[in-house]
Amino acid sequence: MKIKICGLTDPKEAGYVNEQRVDFIGMVLFFPKSKRNITLDRAREIMKCLVTPTLGQVQSIEQAGFDYIQIHGEIPSGYSESCHLPVLKAFNIRDMRDFPQYSTNPAVAGYVFDAAEPGSGQVFDWNLVKEIPQDDKLFFLAGGLNLGNVAEAISCIHPDGVDVSSGVEYGKDRTGKDPEKIRAFVSRARQPVGEGV
């Protein structure tokens, strides 16, 4: 089971996730509406998450040495000709109808299926993604995942990976990622299906 922890805002959080051998780390860039938005300089060595980036932004990210780019909006026109970063195309439950046009896009290495408001901690009806064909591309489930529901989500959907942000944060009184919640989430997500549920 691959695990992605998204929305890191502080370099020390990278240490927390590295201790747990998390597969992917995401940062929110070029989206100031998010409370997790940070600068490119702050995010240079970890994976990023963008909402409809410009071609220039994608090229900057590629030059910074990232391995993937997660895009919530449209993939920029001319992407395949100008950039070589594999795309994790994010879909929220409101734009699932757009899935077929991306399933054949050679730039798309995988999908992230999320709630209507990514990063909100809201769970969506997982049955909505059960009919999505699981092809040779990575299939991540996101949207309100936390210690209490990640094992059930994995058992129900059988994704290649899970993506969490608010589910491993401290809470209302303190911002940032909680190392204990990260440890517990990773442990639960990596349990064989059927154990501890």
Predicted stretch roles:
Residues M1-V197:
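Conserved N-terminal beta1-alpha1 strand-loop-helix module at the mouth
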